[in-house]
Amino acid sequence: MLFIIIQKAFGRYYNAPKTGIMSFMRQTLTTMLGKTVKKAAQIRGGSGSALPGLVIEKIDSDFVSRTLQQLPMGVALISGTNGKTTTTKIVVELLESQGLKVFTNRTGSNFTRGVAAALLGEVDLHGRIDADIAVLELDEAYAVHFVKAIKPNYCLLLNVMRDQLDRFGEIDNTAKLLHNVAINTTKCVVLNRDDPRLSSPDFVNDIESPLRSFGVNPKYLQTFPSDDSLHSNYQSMARLYADDTSLEEFKDQHAVIAFGGNDHPIDLNLRGIYNLQNATGAIALVRAILGNSLNVDSMLEALSNIKPAFGRGEQLIIDGQPCELVLVNPAGFRLALASFDPANYATMIAINDAYADGRDMSWLWDVDFDSLQEQGVTAVSGVRAYDMALRLEYDEVPIDFVDTDLAVALRQLITKHTRQPKRIYCSYTAMLALRRLLARYTDVEEIR
């Protein structure tokens, strides 16, 4: 009904030729309507990252492409199954360390409407944006629609994993979605050389833009498994490209990343070994964007100070003790369990099955939970709490409490372990709900 009212009231602007004064009026009107809806959504307690974008999609489908075309350095797109939000945050902060103004979809809302909503927070009332470049995290399927409207100048393709088979079908279909992004990229494609579905000749042969890659020293490939190494004997066909960026060594949060013919030691604030891989990919993309103008020292200093994206290893303080939120999916869960020592931590696991989480819970059986056997799990919650509890039972992990109600389970975790650090592994929608609940106990950064 809202869309019908808007079209009737302002139809002459949206049906007019897309040039000159009418185009300017359309941009201004769309911006004002979108900002109004965004503010109303926030007043009602939402993040303002979904409804405003949906309204924009319905009334003015060209708004995003028209706005992004203003940017002198164009668009860098980041996609893949795992690591998009954190890698995007790293790329943004590294580019900002070089003096650039960067637009990004900071909330991690990685559908096209999320980009539209994020733009509404950055443009002035006439739809003008003050930025040099856009760095956008996009879901694989929505990235395909995005590149039909506006071709990215650069793209970074992280990985292809099977945790979204209920959405995309066969894993090869996910690779095809990313291939479509790659062939529509105009200046440079950066890909994960250790993922055989992204580095195979079938994937790269018809990509016309220059190729760069990132990866890890071969001795660490088992630590960072691709989907094929987890589920088959398929061997990587990875090729080395001229401008490679490689994670050569790491221990805890210290890493040595090689590029430009030199090894660069770095200490990161980001916890989790998967973030070392994300950082390596981010550096590769920033190098592709800036070329010889890159100030390496400034970039590495910025990298050492980057903090986790919300819900991705984010650390809150409750009663003087840390409480970590760790977003999980199949590959992410495996690497998170390998990254974080459970000793002395009270652990909660919260799993939902909404569209953004993935509805097929069979992936839980791909994760090895043996590392939690000694410490056990304090609480299991979320829509799929009992599926998760059953999975833990098979790995002989002790569980204190199971309840599908996140508020009840969170209260159990906090009240039983007031003087102990806490860690919550959670799926995407569970993470969003838990951040709202945690605001009752401590300060939680509001995401707009």
Provide a role label for each language-model segment.
Residues 136, 155-157, 191, 213, ...:
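Structural beta-sheet core signal
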Residues 11-14, 18-210:
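Phosphate-binding loop of NTP-binding sites
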Residues 11, 16-51, 183, 210, ...:
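ATP-dependent carboxylate-amine ligase
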Residues 157, 161-319:
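Acidic, Mg2+-coordinating active-site environments of NTP-dependent enzymes
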Residues 107-110, 159-163, 216-219, 351-354, ...:
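Short, acidic/turn-prone active-site loops that include or flank metal/cofactor-
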Residues 88-92, 102, 283, 389, ...:
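A generic structural signal for short, well-ordered alpha-helical segments in conserved domains
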Residues 91, 95, 115-119, 279-289, ...:
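Buried hydrophobic packing segments
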